[in-house]
Amino acid sequence: MIQSFIITGFLGVGKTTMLTNTVKKYFKNKKIAIVVNEFGDIGVDSKILTNVHSEVLEISEGCICCKLAQEFESGVSEIVNKYNPDIIFVETSGASEPFPIFLSLQNLGISIEGIICVVDAKNFDTYKENSTAKYQLGGSNIIILNKVDLVTPAELEEVKKEVIQIKEEYNIKNNLTGETVFNNYMIHYAEQGLVNKEVFEGVYQIDEVIGLAKDYKHLDHTGKDSITQKVAYLKENVRFNDIDQLLSALPKSIYRTKGIVKVTDVPNPIFINYSFGDASYEELPEYKEKSLLIFIGESIADDVKLLSQKFPFLILPQFSINK
């Protein structure tokens, strides 16, 4: 039977990095398929993961829920029939909860080895009140505290305490018995997106057919903490320092920025990964498309417009993505 893992977690917590490192380190001799649920219709993470493995299916629009379940299931079925992979990894959008994906994989008869929620130990305090983040924890049976090398032992202990509290409050329940589903969840630690192989050895396999979770309501993503995305393209003749200055000027409302840009003083296109004030860069020699940046946050339309005025190399489309 084909195995699967669902990788969930809030925006910018390090899901793609963890998945990339996992596939490279532990599954070199396995046939791996990766399904990416991007936020919006421009897939940056899928381009990164394609560099690691060729079988990457992208499901856009931000959330695999009722309207996308059929697309997701047909896409996964096509992967199964065409490639017959040993393991399927599904990386959810940071703006969506994992439970609808769980149901779809169950419908397909695929063994779900674990629902892994990645938590940013350094920045957890900045997003812990977001309802999506809470449902992500509640719908998981494996929790990875990432970036533990960037916090003190006391800070890590406080994050762990808060994670457990949210997990127990938002844990999904069987709608037939009313019992909590993931009582035996596990917490692991990760530094720079690398976790122990034990996480992926199937010791947490989910055998129970849950059906719909008790009191489960799919988030409509239109509430006060709903997440907005804006896309900007870049003019030519942009220098690396221009990008660095832009990222330094981002307001707190924009807590996630990613994209791939071409700059005049670096030979290859650069993948930019910014979250909560921290930025990392990686060269992508194979990228041939336009330079673009994706800004993600809460109520950011005016902020992005101001950025385009301050940094004229940003080009805002006439119709920006707002989902």
Question: Model-predicted segments: where are they?
Answer:
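C-terminal partner/receptor-binding element of secreted or periplasmic proteins
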Residues: 303-315
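Flexible loop/N-cap segments at domain edges
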Residues: 295
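Nucleotide-state-sensitive switch-loop elements of NTP-binding domains
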Residues: 2-8, 13, 17-127
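Short, solvent-exposed amphipathic alpha-helical segments in soluble enzyme
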Residues: 49-51, 105-107, 134, 248-249, ...
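Phosphate/Mg2+-binding loops and adjacent switch elements
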Residues: 78, 82-190, 195
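Helical mechanochemical/support elements of P-loop NTPase systems and associated helical scaffolds
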Residues: 3, 68, 97, 136, ...
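C-terminal accessory "lid"/substrate-recognition subdomains
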Residues: 142, 151-290, 299-300, 314-323
